[in-house]
Design a protein with these regions (language model features):
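Helix-turn-helix
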Residues: 25-28, 32-74
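Hydrophobic alpha-helical segments that form the core
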Residues: 117-119, 164-183, 196-203
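C-terminal peripheral helix-coil segments that are non-catalytic and often amphipathic
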Residues: 2-16, 95-112, 141-157, 176, ...
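Amphipathic alpha-helical segments used for helix-helix packing
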Residues: 110-133
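Short, basic, alpha-helical segments at the C-terminal edge of helix-turn-helix-like DNA-binding modules
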Residues: 77-83
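Hydrophobic alpha-helical connector segments
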Residues: 74, 85-115, 166-173
């Protein structure tokens, strides 16, 4: 039988507080690494810079993340987990799943650091020796596949305009969103990413 911490006892309370502090520090490291990777890219950021931003020593950072690669992958996994929860909440399908993306794009417009992170790293990761290369290959494959399923479901429900092929539509939508993010990061003042995605989907969906 497993043991649990008794917070009413001194040792249990000490361990509980210690674990909580460790989790909080780990979260702070992930947040600061996200910002720095977004500003300078993976190759342009050092662990010492991240440690300094967090107010801890280099060995202190290595206690939580022994390598720069492990930190990068933890940052990416954390962001994916958060965003995936938003996308799949309520288990939408078909046209509803596609329209859910408008809200995600609107949210991204309030998270410049996250958009910078993925834009910079996805460009860097085109190099086969980049530690996030496989991650981004898998991520794009998964996103395109999920969108293709959503378009196919919309077609089966009679919600997709004639002549639209799900596989192509999925890739076009990913390309549109990525392109909009780059233009937005470059400072286009007239660009409303969410509105552009919404208009694109309206041109494809019947309901």
């Amino acid at each position: 039988m497993g043991q649990t911490l008794d917070e009413s006892r001194p040792l249990g309370k000490y361990l509980f507080v210690g674990y909580a502090k460790g989790r909080a520090k780990r979260r702070d490291i992930l947040d600061q690494a996200t910002a720095l990777f977004g500003e300078a890219g993976y190759r342009g950021t050092s662990l010492r810079e991240i440690a300094a931003r967090c107010g801890i020593s280099h060995p202190g950072l290595l206690h939580h993340f022994p390598t720069k690669e492990s930190l990068l992958l933890a940052v990416l996994a954390h962001r994916d987990e958060v965003d995936q929860e938003r996308v799949t909440a309520g288990h939408p399908s078909g046209a509803a799943a596609l329209r859910r993306l408008v809200g995600i794009v609107a949210l991204n417009a309030t998270r410049r650091g996250i958009v910078e992170l993925f834009t910079v790293l996805s460009a860097e990761a085109t190099a086969a020796d980049h530690p996030a290369h496989e991650y981004f290959v898998d991520r794009y494959s998964r996103i395109v596949r999920e969108l293709e399923v959503a378009y196919a479901e919309a077609r089966e429900a009679g919600d997709l305009r004639p002549g639209i092929e799900p596989a192509r539509a999925a890739r076009d939508l990913v390309a549109l969103m990525d392109g909009l993010q780059i233009q937005w990061l470059l400072g286009d003042p007239a660009l409303d990413m969410a509105a552009a995605v919404e208009e694109h989907l309206k041109s494809q969906l019947l309901s």
